[in-house]
Amino acid sequence: RESFAVQVVRQLFPTWSSIDVARIREEDEQTILLLLTEGVDILRSVGQVFSTAAFDGMMMPGSPTVKVGLSIDSNLVEISPIADEVPMNEVGALLNSYRRNRRYHRFKDGTFVDLKNADLHELDQIVTDLDLDEQQIDSGRITIPGYRAFLLDAQVDDDGKSESFVDYV
């Protein structure tokens, strides 16, 4: 059993040595993900595993959802990405990971989020149709001419539309 545990540690920690602490480089996202998604469970099968709150928080529970809010102000449509669990200044990077069909996205704070069941389709469609870039998305509020409201009306669920937007359309 002990030899199996040593083999598991060698697989999970590429810089492992018998005289030093097992480590994973911070830049090695694939190995970190392997440890978070499968490695801890494998280690638990051969012994007790203790972890810190910081380690346990490296994997965001669930999948991210980013909805789109629409409102009208001075004949301009305001588009606001609404994401409770995603930092607003990282929505663009999250969308880029989603578009590249990555299984996971890593936020600037080091937290990973599973994109397998991410609900980003609505935002992706609007960003594509309006040819918006990551910086515009990260700003939190995008303003476009009012005549484009009719295009957006069909793409966004009614619960994302303000009363001013519904009245305008």
Model-derived features with residue positions:
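Accessory nucleic-acid engagement and inter-domain coupling regions
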Residues: 1-169
